Curated annotation (Swiss-Prot):
HAMAP family with a match to the protein in the record: GatA (MF_00120)
GO cellular component annotations of the record: glutamyl-tRNA(Gln) amidotransferase complex
Catalytic activity: L-glutamyl-tRNA(Gln) + L-glutamine + ATP + H2O = L-glutaminyl-tRNA(Gln) + L-glutamate + ADP + phosphate + H(+)
Homology family: Belongs to the amidase family. GatA subfamily.
Functional note: Allows the formation of correctly charged Gln-tRNA(Gln) through the transamidation of misacylated Glu-tRNA(Gln) in organisms which lack glutaminyl-tRNA synthetase. The reaction takes place in the presence of glutamine and ATP through an activated gamma-phospho-Glu-tRNA(Gln).
InterPro entries for this protein: Amidase, Amidase_CS, Amidase_dom, AS_sf, GatA
A matching Pfam family: Amidase
The enzyme's E.C. designation: 6.3.5.7
GO MF, one annotated term: ATP binding
GO biological process: translation
The protein's name: Glutamyl-tRNA(Gln) amidotransferase subunit A
Oligomer status and interactors: Heterotrimer of A, B and C subunits.
Disulfide bonds: none
Length: 483
């Protein structure tokens, strides 16, 4: 039994009693990385020397018994800036970018005394659903190395599933935490928009992006979200909402819980094996005293189209800062300022990023703004209202995290429309800004299936309660890939 088979709470107790040291945990991480990283490719940059340095300091100072995360190893998605540790967003244009400040979540993790093992692979600028658009390498799913881990936080999910780190941070713009968590058989939470500061997150679509935790179990996830949540003066979209002790909500009691199951989430396009796993999960929740009804989110069908117009439009604006002048890659072949801009961006961005920048610029252009961008915003309002309507009568909404299990590497990379349609069950949640968690709920042909539990605004505690009650009745979260 490896050290990472223990939960956060169990490891904390061992650290406080000095049965193990932070140095032991960091060693466990790097030994595992040495053993499996060549197969999975979770990381872009390792932080080995600094990690062992912090571990020794914490070992000498002693673990704070009131600090649940002290001395525990974490991996951080490579679009979250880390002072003096290369941060690339998996793009050539930021290949050698060395940030001069920490993201707010990184500062909070340092205050919590976690130990950063390294920066995790992702789709370039978080644009993708498979971690295949990374400039550096493709990440492989630990359950089947011929398949994708999901995306864009594929490295964050694969590192946890492969036991390279205890937990990780990802970001979720249209499903980028929940879908890889589902594909890799781990737990991933997308918090309410504004719950976690985005300061220091390299922006893709600012009205949709949200940072969240990926862990092996629900309790660990709750501890990590507690540590990174809260108002931040550096992020005007962060919301002044009290940071609850999410871990206190894990009572196992969900008697009387009212679940809405959208007919749109179990219809055509959802794999039979995925659908069956979700229906079985609903039976488990019924046994625990919950009830469920079929409901409708009628505007879900417009989710993917609206999302790709809005997200791409915001990306075309956000990514205009990468111009070869201030930081990042600069084309050596330019002789004029105009050439510097065009060549730097043509050479520095990958195909998918360029595709979305062009799509967004087109949607925002004169003559098309009303037809595309404005229409997408109107559809977003309707999608948001769908959720508001259902939550008037139901406590949570439940469905699959993804319509399929993990697909083959290179299986969809040249078919962007099919790839985009994979996000059909996750993008409405980002458009509405509500929280959702993916928890393992079974297997289909040996591949993990994720159950998506969606809550009303700032009801993460309820999501954790439901997810934890389900987890306690099942063993799916204890299953591990054979690497």
């Amino acid at each position: 039994m490896g050290l990472f088979d223990f939960s956060v709470k169990e490891l904390h107790d061992k650290l406080v009693k000095k049965e193990i040291s932070p140095f032991d945990l960091v060693s466990e991480s790097f030994n595992r990385i040495e053993s499996v990283e060549d197969k999975v490719g979770s990381f872009i940059t390792l932080n080995k020397e600094a990690a062992f340095g912090v571990a020794e300091e914490l070992g000498d100072a002693g673990i704070d018994p009131n600090n649940m995360l002290s001395g525990l190893p974490i991996g951080i998605k490579d679009n979250i800036v880390t002072k003096n540790l290369r941060t690339t967003a998996a793009s050539k244009i930021l290949e050698n970018f060395d940030p001069i400040y920490d993201a707010t979540v990184v500062s909070k993790l340092k205050n919590a005394q976690t130990i950063n093992i390294g920066k995790l692979n992702m789709d370039e600028f978080a644009m993708g659903s498979s971690t295949e658009t990374s400039y550096f390498h493709k990440t492989h799913n630990p359950w089947d190395l011929s398949r994708v881990p999901g995306g864009s936080s594929g490295g964050s999910a694969s590192a946890v599933a492969a036991g390279e780190v205890l937990f990780s941070l990802g970001s979720d713009t249209g499903g980028s935490i929940r879908q890889p968590a589902a594909f890799c058989g781990v737990v991933g939470m997308k918090p309410t928009y504004g719950r976690v500061s985005r300061f220091g997150l390299i922006a893709f679509a600012s009205s949709l992006d949200q940072i969240g935790p990926i862990t092996k179990n629900v309790e660990d996830n709750a501890y990590l979200l507690e540590a990174i949540s809260g108002l931040d003066a550096n992020d005007s979209t962060s919301i002044n909402q009290p940071v609850e002790r999410f871990s206190d909500s894990l009572t196992g009691d969900i008697k009387g819980l009212r679940i809405g199951v959208p007919k749109e989430y179990l219809g055509e396009g959802v794999d039979p094996g995925v659908k069956q796993a979700v229906l079985d999960a609903l039976k488990t929740l019924e046994k625990l005293g919950a009830t469920w009804d079929e409901v409708s989110l009628p505007h879900s069908e417009y989710g993917v189209a609206s999302y790709y117009i809005l997200a791409s439009s915001e990306a075309s604006s956000n990514l205009s800062r990468f111009d070869g002048v201030r930081y990042g890659y600069r084309s050596p072949n330019a002789t004029t300022l105009e050439e510097l801009y065009t060549k730097t961006r043509s050479e520095g961005f990958g195909d998918e990023v360029k595709r979305r920048i062009m799509l967004g610029t087109y949607a925002l252009s004169s003559g098309y703004y009303d037809a595309y961008y404005k229409k997408a915003q109107q559809a977003r309002t309707l999608i948001k209202q769908d959720f508001v309507n259902v939550f008037e009568n139901y406590d949570v909404i439940i469905g699959p995290s993804s319509p399929t299990t993990a697909f083959k590497i290179d299986g969809m990379i040249n078919d962007p429309i099919t790839m985009y349609s994979n996000d059909i069950l996750t993008v409405p949640i980002n458009l509405a800004g509500v929280p959702a968690i993916s928890v393992p709920c079974g297997f289909s042909d040996g591949l993990p299936v994720g159950l998506q539990i969606i809550g009303n605004y700032f009801e993460e505690s309820l999501l954790y309660k439901v997810a934890h009650a389900f987890e306690q009745e099942t063993t799916f979260h204890k299953e591990k890939p054979n690497l």
